[in-house]
Amino acid sequence: NISATGRQSTSGFGTLEQGPSQRSLEDVKQYDVVTNVNVGQLLPKKWGIQVPFNYGQSEELITPKYDQFYKDLTLDSRLEAANSSTEREQIKQQSEDYTKRQSINFIGVRKTRTTDAKPRFYDVENLTLNYSYNKVEHRDFEIENAVDKMLRVGANYAFNFNPVKFEPFKKNDSLFTGNYWKILKDFNLNLLPSSFTLNSNINRQFNRQKFREIDLGGPNIGIEELFRRNYTFDFQYTINYNITEALSLNFTAANNNIVRNYFKDNIINGEQDEKLDVWDGFFDFGDPNRQSQDLGITYQVPINKIPTFSFVNATYQYSGNFQWQKGSDLYGELELDGNTYDLGNTIQNANTHNINTTFDMNKLYRYIGLVKKPIARVRARTTPGTPPNPAQNKTNQPQIKNQSTTKLLNAGIDILTSIKRIQLNYSENNGTFLPGYLQTPGFIGTLKPSAGFTFGSQSDIRYLAARRGWLTVFPEFNQQFATTNTKQLDVSASLEPVRDLKIDLVGSRTYYENYTENFRVNATGSTYEYEALTPNTFGNFNISTLLIKTAFSKSDENSSDAFNDFRANRLIIARRLAQNNGADVNDVDANGFPKGFGKNSQAVLLPAFLAAYSGQDARKVKTTAFRDVPIPNWDLKYTGFMKYAWFKKNFKRFSLTHGYRSTYTINQFQSNLDYASPNFSLDYDSQLPEVKDQSGNYKNETLFSNINLTEMFSPLVRIDFEMQNSVKILAEIQKDRLISLSFDNNLMTEVQGNEYIVGLGYRIKDLRINSNLAGPSKRIVSDLNMKADVSVRENKTIIRYLDLENNQVTSGQTIWGLKYSADYAFSKNLTGIFYFDYTFSKYAISTAFPQTTIRSGFTIRYNFGN
């Protein structure tokens, strides 16, 4: 397969429509040749050799009409005025733009299997070779010469092992007869890995460039050529191992080496040797730059093979990651006070634990026999007009009684079996970052600083690495050691306590923590000790909660029942804290609060705030900031109205929906670096000054910037139905609020929102329109769908002061909205849409003006699909 193209154009070339000033002012010569050949076809077919070969070459020469330095002179006139052939050639090359490209590629060179022999791991068929070489030469007015070379050589090895299973109990049917032995009977072990792959690549990029010396007004100053080289060697191998049918393992190790064999006298960052090309030192694998190791484990927990737990499906996944990164060469030999230090490299690891569990409760109910019983039907009289038979009625009475009993029993079973499904997902992510690490990994991987650390373990390795002299001892080292921890819990359940009533429960909890510290390694002789400096912890927290007890209590700009409870709860919480810590409850300040636990102490405000807005008793609420168990929120939908004759007569469908979401969020918490623990065996006045803040309260070990409580009824209630005449009606009420408490200024911000929506929809079936778009029939028959929504939303923001009777509305607005749309399908692919949106906003504060927005128009939508 050979393709060739060529092009030539001269100055003044152009189309008839182009004027003289628009035509080309340069001569262009260009050709391009590309060849694709499978060289393996030239060899005997029985060898099975595949050698895909690709060669390409192109050149482009652009000669301008005018000289590039003297723009008002033609190039020909300058060449004629040249004093010598050397000067003439110099002027010509200075004006020309010349580019030459060459590429040689062998991609996918391999031997295919030509026999039915059993594959072996040492077969050459498992190997694939790749070679790619590209070269670009260029010169123009500014660049005297430039050469770019890119070389890539790779080898890939892949082999899939045939499974060798060990199943010792598979055929022992006489020994394992019961279902409870199934978990042991199904025991299996795969003795060989599933697959092994190995990839290696040599990548070399070379660039040489020299700028042209143009009109320097004297002899050339001898601008040096610029060199840029990027030589790397990449090596990676992967092992996939299905240890059992339920347990699989994946391990990948990857190395990235930097090759720097082009420096004179092997001095890194020194002078480069100009004579060396991409082929010199080709098999020099260089020094490690980056190394990573990844371990993945998936385990299908066989608990469902035990009959009692057959309703449980559980999966555990683990991933561990390790990465070593070379440090900067600039800090490899850093001098300070006559000593030379190495600031080292960085290592980091991470792991992830995922547990996904599903409980199919219907299987559990069937296993324990909690299923509804069929209702026996009473035999009716067979002959119309026949008088009742007293004996038969007497026989049917026990059946009717049993039928009522069965219905009652089934109703109870419906309630007991209302939980249909439970889903529990837990994930935990951990990571460690350690700078100043002096060790270098091996070629195929490393087990330092510990085997566990390289596979993702979060065991503390700081002190071990320091004792073994693996950390830098530079006294002014300021990179931080860091760890991260994230825990996520999601719980959901589906309930159906009665027919057509579906309830979805959801709960979640998220905890994120980041720990950082500076450190110093003190060297005393041959002993090294790790010293932690300025430890700091920060993070955030979020959990689903329940605020419905105060959702409908009075709360406006004049007063708030929950806020008044918040104020009153402070004293109760303060006395509890003082009592729990062994402080004197009767030793009070001017406001009547125990000393050290004042009315504006963070330790007092937080539980008092949570108790007030969640409707809990301040005498029983937890005084800590974090909660362990998420409280579920819910979505509810009832569609059982259509069972009743009146609804069935007047409606096609009728549903009632309700939803509730509420969360408790700590936006940021961090450790108090100024914290000092008080001695509660002493009275308040005898405490050390450093245990108290400026307000005289005991300092808190953890500081919070602000906490938020959010609540949404989405919707509070929604009625959605369609009448028999195809009129669709939707009525919806939404309610939400956001309460934020700032510990910086002890201000509470409350954002309230209420929205009312009424929607109408109607479909005119088979509306006929005369149009040429319909083809020969000249008539389009389609449905016209119309929809209108009217909404009113009120929201306002109120700032409340704890110690002042001065609530203020700082923002808010009332928004009226009207949306109307109509769509009509002119064909299978063409739809026309008319829309009209009207919005009017009236703000709650006098400094903002009312605003009206109207959007209307037509949309034509064409679907290019089938």
What are these regions (language model features)?
Residues N1-N866:
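Exposed, low-structure sequence patches enriched in small/polar residues
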